[in-house]
From Swiss-Prot:
Gene3D superfamilies: 1.10.8.60, DNA helicase RuvA subunit, C-terminal domain (1.10.8.10), P-loop containing nucleotide triphosphate hydrolases (3.40.50.300). ATPase subunit of a proteasome-like degradation complex; this subunit has chaperone activity. The binding of ATP and its subsequent hydrolysis by HslU are essential for unfolding of protein substrates subsequently hydrolyzed by HslV. HslU recognizes the N-terminal part of its protein substrates and unfolds these before they are guided to HslV for hydrolysis. Disulfide bonds: none annotated. It is found in: Cytoplasm. This is ATP-dependent protease ATPase subunit HslU. GO terms for molecular function: ATP binding; ATP hydrolysis activity; peptidase activity; proteasome-activating activity.
Length: 451
């Protein structure tokens, strides 16, 4: 069944999941273990026979830690690893039902949209070779119209010209040749419905209604063969996939494998020392409760049960405490993990160890201009020390501080890169970092505004 639906039956042990997360995220061992156990529990649940399987619910997680330490990245990487529908929302964007603002049910609708897109891409990937072949035939029909069937065999004659053009197109020798092709264009393609905040569902319903009224018509367009192949392959793939199967698979994938990450949950916790009514706090928690407990939400694709969706809530909890959340919601977030603030050593590892570390990214970017950046060990240590120092003396924004520092560090290089000689080498050592960032980092007032 799962193979038919297209999503992965992830049979990785928690240890293997943590090792995979270690390739992208530094530290936060406890948080990684918690999400790895949650993902493995999903696999275990699938091995249990019904009716007990449907009674086993996911153990939702509450992550507590300052901004920029990896809370969102852990959840995002986990979803990517499982190839599961994933959505990140901010609790502060939602208000209690009856007030102006987004309704919490839209979280599940957005999750289903993500799942539909995921399943559609998978379905198109499965028919990719057929679609490309059909697109190639349509391009060849423009260049060399098909010959009629022979009277004796009823088969098409093999046209040498058609065969020659096919080989040239496959060798990409005709990519820039301009041809005129017929493409599909829906009558409602350019209709966009604008609705007030909180009424996105009405917008999608109206769009669907106009789409059903609109009919597809053929339009002739001139484009290069390279672009024509892409456009026509997309059309052919759209025709080859079964939209009913995609919808069914997407709903099942969202229900069984969906991951919802609710950020800034602490901002809707009602602090005990603050009185008065607060629409965006306790009311939002009470509206979130049915989703987390398990309920059925109506979407344009059908009814979605949230019983087995994994919810990961996170917050810094600087002013509020986890105990300030309503007791019912606390009970639905049984796994608590506290993430550590980043040290100077963590910053150093973040700069160098991940598969797509910042240093690798910037080195690759400048290499496109034939400018070779070399970060020395003392230079990396200095950047890490400054990041830690600025976070400590101003606002702690975690690893995001490194983006600001390196952007500042490479600002003049980025501006002048195109004017430099090819093959230039720039060594970024401790002296270079001190010269560029030292004065700003030591001046607290400047740090607040610039770094």
């Amino acid at each position: 069944m799962e193979k038919l639906l297209g999503y992965r039956d992830l049979n990785m042990t928690p240890r293997e999941i943590v090792e995979e997360l270690d390739r992208h995220i530094i530290g936060q061992k406890h948080a990684k273990r918690a999400v790895a156990n949650a993902l493995r529990s999903r696999w275990r649940r699938k091995q249990v026979a019904e009716p007990l399987r449907s009674e086993i619910t996911p153990k939702n997680i509450l992550m507590i830690g300052p901004t920029g330490v990896g809370k969102t990245e852990i959840a995002r990487r986990l979803a990517k690893l499982a190839e599961a529908p994933f959505i990140k929302v901010e609790a502060t964007k939602f208000t209690e039902v009856g007030y102006v603002g987004r309704d919490v049910d839209s979280i599940i609708r957005d999750l289903v949209e993500t799942s539909i897109k995921l399943e559609k891409n998978r379905a198109k990937e499965r028919v990719k070779s057929k679609a490309r072949e059909a697109a190639l035939e349509r391009v060849l029909d423009v260049l060399v119209p098909r010959k009629k069937q022979t009277a004796w065999t009823g088969e098409e004659e093999i046209d040498p010209a058609r065969k020659m053009y096919r080989e040239r197109i496959l060798r990409e020798e005709m990519n820039d040749t301009v041809i005129e092709i017929e493409t599909n264009q829906s009558m409602s393609a350019n209709v966009e419905i604008m609705t007030p905040p909180g009424m996105e569902e009405m917008s999608s319903q109206l769009s669907e209604m106009f789409k059903s009224f609109g009919r597809e018509k053929k339009t002739k367009r001139k484009m290069t063969i390279a672009k024509a192949l892409i456009q026509l392959a997309e059309e052919e793939a759209e025709a080859l996939v079964s939209h009913e199967e995609i919808k069914s698979a997407a709903i099942d994938n969202a229900e069984q494998n969906g991951i919802v990450f609710i950020d800034e949950i602490d901002k809707v916790a009602r602090r005990s020392d603050v009185g008065g009514a607060d629409v965006s706090r306790e009311g939002v928690q009470r509206d979130l409760l049915p989703l987390v407990e398990g309920c059925t939400i109506s979407t344009k694709y059908g009814m979605i049960k949230t019983d087995h969706i994994l919810f990961i809530a996170s917050g810094a909890f600087h002013l509020a405490k986890p105990s300030d959340l309503i007791p019912e919601l606390q009970g639905r977030l049984p796994v608590r993990v506290e993430l550590d603030a980043l040290t100077a050593d963590d910053f150093k590892r973040i700069l160098t160890e991940p598969d797509a570390s910042l240093i690798k990214q910037y080195t690759a970017l400048f290499a496109t201009e034939q400018l070779h950046l070399e970060f020395t060990e003392d230079g990396i240590n200095k950047i890490a020390e400054i990041a830690y120092h600025v976070n400590k003396t101003t606002e702690n924004i975690g690893a995001r501080r490194l983006h600001t520092l390196i952007e500042r560090l490479t600002d003049s290089l980025s501006f002048d890169a195109a004017d430099r000689r090819d093959g230039d080498r720039v060594i970024i050592d401790a002296a270079y970092v001190e010269k560029t960032l030292g004065e700003i980092s030591n001046n607290e007032d400047l740090s607040r505004f610039i770094l």
